[in-house]
Design a protein with these regions (language model features):
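Flexible loop residues that form catalytic
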Residues: 43, 59, 88, 155, ...
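Active-site-proximal helices and loops of the catalytic beta/alpha 8
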Residues: 34, 47-150, 166
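The substrate-binding groove and active-site-proximal loops of carbohydrate-active enzymes
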Residues: 9-29, 51-62, 113-125, 159, ...
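Generic structural "secondary-structure junction" signal
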Residues: 15-18, 102, 106, 110, ...
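Substrate-binding/active-site clefts of carbohydrate-active enzymes
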Residues: 1-47, 70, 76, 93, ...
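Short, hydrophobic/amphipathic alpha-helical packing segments
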Residues: 32-36, 64-67, 197-202
Length: 203
């Protein structure tokens, strides 16, 4: 039997062969072929019949060198294509104009959740603004207009549930992800969120 290294230990998801800077050539070309198929299905050079963008899951698990080559391919097919990536921490390295146009902006989410969650000792308005301004300065201006500023996602609890249940500040994805897993958390309120959570949403 074959035994593969699995992505994050998931044996059903074998890891691609790669170097420090790129995916192995056969894997890279396979992904490139998929990209061409979806962006220009009939291969006539007109992308009007193809998709207009990509959202890449766990993009931080793939080398930067691959994303740079992939971006060049995508933009050669459709210069207007939108490329966004799941990056759960600071994304400066991905938003230099040679990889992605935008990211899922979890770094915006953490201070926002902490500020509005009724059961968390909220940071001051000054601290909240400092966190947001730090991000505004870190990313290129053109990226700021297309970032995905999200309050929840398919990977974590919905915002009303998080507002109801969060009791301490959250500043990084692993803690946020683990917190939203109900199993083993008898204190996690799984019924309809109470009025305090909805009041926070209305703010």
């Amino acid at each position: 039997t074959f035994e593969y290294d699995g992505w994050f230990g998931h044996k059903a998801l074998p890891e691609f062969a790669r170097s420090r800077t790129d995916l192995a050539a056969p894997v890279r070309e396979y992904v490139f072929d998929i990209t061409r198929r979806w962006m220009d299905p009939d291969g006539d050079g007109d992308p009007a019949d193809g998709i207009d963008g990509w959202r890449l899951d766990v993009a931080y698990c793939v080398p930067h060198g691959f994303w740079r080559k992939w971006r060049r391919l995508v933009k050669s097919i459709n210069p207007e294509a939108y490329l966004t990536a799941e990056i759960v921490n600071r994304a400066d390295e991905y938003l230099k104009g040679d990889e992605f146009d935008a990211v899922m902006n979890y770094m915006w989410l953490y201070p926002t959740l902490n500020f509005f969650a009724p059961n968390v000792k909220a940071p001051s308005v000054r601290e909240f603004r400092r966190c947001q301004n730090e991000l505004l300065k870190a990313y290129p201006e053109e990226a700021l207009y297309v970032l995905q500023n999200l309050l929840d996602s398919h990977d974590v609890g919905r915002i009303a549930s998080m507002l109801e249940n969060v009791r301490e500040p959250i500043a990084e994805f692993q803690k946020y992800f683990e917190f939203s897993r109900v199993h083993g958390r008898p204190e996690f309120v799984t019924t309809r969120p109470g009025p305090a959570a909805y009041q926070a949403l209305r703010q």
